[in-house]
């Protein structure tokens, strides 16, 4: 069985994104910095698959310590996952990607951050049971 996981952070009410970025991007509060550090530590040496916007936000240094694959929601997910036999695969998002890959994810690593501001993208709890609540 392929080891497929999701790693993401959400705000207090499930906020995921705002204007194409993390709503808390650039926040230097130690809890936010710790979450970013943890993301890079957990994915190090593994595969990170994500949509183009998510991959575009990954700093250049991160490409040397993990395999990063830009995927599209229309790609066959089973074919994508088969590219990495024996590897741990993290699905990094965004929403269109999670809508497709939710049914393959065996472990959800979700960090709730102390952000309670605005957002235009939200975490869908239906992903936790294998599918999108809304299409």
Swiss-Prot record:
Pfam families for this protein: DHFR_1
Matches recorded under InterPro entries: DHFR-like_dom_sf, DHFR_dom
Catalytic activity line of the entry: 5,6,7,8-tetrahydromethanopterin + NAD(+) = 7,8-dihydromethanopterin + NADH + H(+); 5,6,7,8-tetrahydromethanopterin + NADP(+) = 7,8-dihydromethanopterin + NADPH + H(+)
Endpoints of the signal sequence: none
Keywords annotated in UniProt: NADP, Oxidoreductase
Loss of function: phenotype: Mutants have a C1-defective and methanol-sensitive phenotype.
Role this protein plays: Catalyzes the reduction of dihydromethanopterin (H(2)MPT) to tetrahydromethanopterin (H(4)MPT). Shows preference for NADPH rather than NADH as electron donor. Does not reduce dihydrofolate.
Subunit-structure text: Homodimer.
Name of the protein: Dihydromethanopterin reductase
Lineage: Bacteria, Pseudomonadati, Pseudomonadota, Alphaproteobacteria, Hyphomicrobiales
Gene for this chain: dmrA
